[in-house]
Amino acid sequence: MNPHERIERHFSAHIEAAQEALTMLGDAIEIAAAKLAHCLLSDGKILCCGNGGSAAQAQHFSSEMLNRFERERPGLPAVALTTDTSTLTSIANDYHFDEVFAKQVRALGHAGDILVIYSTSGISPSVLSAAVAAQDRDMSIIALNGRDGGTLAPLLRDTDVEIRVTAPSTARIQEIHLLITHCLCDLVDHQLFGE
């Protein structure tokens, strides 16, 4: 396969994954956006976490909320739990890496807040621990998950929202998670600030 054919294959796989996500996940995205807007209107905040590329996506979502998406508006309270290297490394060193997000959720999260989890597999112990900590704090969870949902999917309650991209490729899951993130940002802005 030559380079151009490889490029075409990536674009085709992306388009196919996006179309499947639109068909399968539109309702869940809409529900998640409504929950985020309700949380913010109720003076709650959003905490975000993930590992690796999913950490970058958590930071991206948080920055779009805190700063702006595609229009001028006041900043919205969102915190990426992935950014403070002193906190992350002290928790990992003093306790265990599994606790890097959970300890922050227990310290910062309150009833009515939302934890947004990004995971391509649903099996990372650190996000699983964060989910349990959020539930203990009576927080809702929005999980941008992947593949078969892993161990995360069965942890979720009826009040939580799972947006699961079932693509077999980590790259495709991350691409669709980014598209979903932008949909959530747009819908939250629309619900809070109108057209």
From Swiss-Prot:
Q: Which residues bind substrate?
A: N51, G52, G53, E64, N93, D94, S119, T120, S121, S124, Q174
Its Enzyme Commission number(s) read 5.3.1.28
Which cofactors is this protein said to need? Zn(2+)
InterPro entries tied to this protein: GmhA/DiaA, Phosphoheptose_Isoase, SIS_dom, SIS_dom_sf, SIS_GmhA/DiaA_subfam
What single Pfam family name could you report for this chain, choosing any that match? SIS_2
Name the keywords, alphabetized.
Answer: Carbohydrate metabolism, Cytoplasm, Isomerase, Metal-binding, Zinc
Per the record, the GO terms for biological process are: carbohydrate metabolic process; D-glycero-D-manno-heptose 7-phosphate biosynthetic process
Q: Where is the SIS domain?
A: 36-195
Q: Which EC class is this protein assigned?
A: isomerase
Q: What pathway does this protein act in?
A: Carbohydrate biosynthesis; D-glycero-D-manno-heptose 7-phosphate biosynthesis; D-glycero-alpha-D-manno-heptose 7-phosphate and D-glycero-beta-D-manno-heptose 7-phosphate from sedoheptulose 7-phosphate: step 1/1
**UniProt-annotated location(s):** Cytoplasm
- Residues at which Zn(2+) binds: H60, E64, Q174, H182
Presence of keyword Lyase: no
Q: What else is known?
A: The reaction produces a racemic mixture of D-glycero-alpha-D-manno-heptose 7-phosphate and D-glycero-beta-D-manno-heptose 7-phosphate.
What this chain does, per the entry, is described as: Catalyzes the isomerization of sedoheptulose 7-phosphate in D-glycero-D-manno-heptose 7-phosphate.
Q: Which family does it belong to?
A: Belongs to the SIS family. GmhA subfamily.
Extract the HAMAP family matched here.
GmhA (MF_00067)
The identity of this protein, by name, is Phosphoheptose isomerase
- Taxonomic source organism: Methylococcus capsulatus (strain ATCC 33009 / NCIMB 11132 / Bath)
